[in-house]
Amino acid sequence: MFNEREALRLRLEQLNEAEVKVIREYQIERDKIYAKLRELDRNGSPSEIKKDFRSEKKPDSLPVLAELAAQEIRSYQPQSQQQSVQPQLQSISSLPAGIPDGTTRRRRGTARPGSKAAKLREAAIKTLKRHNAAIKSSELQKEIEKESGLEIPNMTTFMQSLIKMYPEVKKPYRGQYILEGEIESAESANE
């Protein structure tokens, strides 16, 4: 029976999925901006770089949001408290900022390559690639377990995490999954 509690739980899940999607979009845009800034740093003349970028933000300065938060704190505190906060802000500003050159972000909560979850995910992607149409969850679970030799304790949770990691995996109907689009390989995506 579909009651109010179930409806609220379903809405929370939908909100979580929408939030993850928006966060992913922001991360992609932020990565593009950082890449463009690094490219401009490499291609621009040293005098232009100093004028445009370095004078505004030092390499070891706080990220923009942290700087704004520190300014907010300063504006709300009386003068006597500002003196005690100043040493704390200096220690915070010594932390590295932004994404270091040549590195990619790794999503939190992802399993290490070679782990049980990674093997199951790889088997799931291979199985979904073999099927052109939607496949029942129970059939998919049997094929994944047969291919990987590992047991999936909770198929719903496993597939939800797979969908978050690979947006190409879709759930067209209740209890059915399909792979729409291309995924190079599960191994290269985990690196």
From Swiss-Prot:
Coiled coil location: 2-43
Protein name, entry field: Repressor Rok
Disruption phenotype: Increased expression of comK, increases transformation about 5-fold, decreases sporulation efficiency about 5-fold. Increased excision of mobile element ICEBs1.
InterPro entries: WH_Rok
Location relative to the cell: Cytoplasm, Nucleoid
Region (Disordered): 75-116
Job description of the protein: Repressor of comK, the master regulator of competence development. Overexpression seems to be lethal. Represses at least 20 genes that specify membrane-localized and secreted proteins, including some that encode products with antibiotic activity. Binds to many AT-rich sites in the chromosome, many of which are known or thought to derive from horizontal gene transfer; helps keep mobile element ICEBs1 quiescent in the genome. Binds to its own promoter and is thus probably autoregulatory.
Extent of Low complexity compositional bias: 75-96
Region (DNA-binding): 95-191
Factors inducing expression: Expression is constant during late log phase and for at least 2 hours in stationary phase (at protein level). Probably repressed by AbrB and SinR, as well as partially by ComK. Probably negatively regulates its own expression. There are 1000-3000 proteins/chromosome in exponential phase grown in minimal medium.
A GO molecular-function annotation: DNA binding
Chief localization: cytoplasm
Comment on protein domains: The C-terminus (residues 95-191) binds DNA.
Keyword Nucleus attributed: no
Domain of life: Bacteria
CC terms in the record's Gene Ontology section: cytoplasm; nucleoid
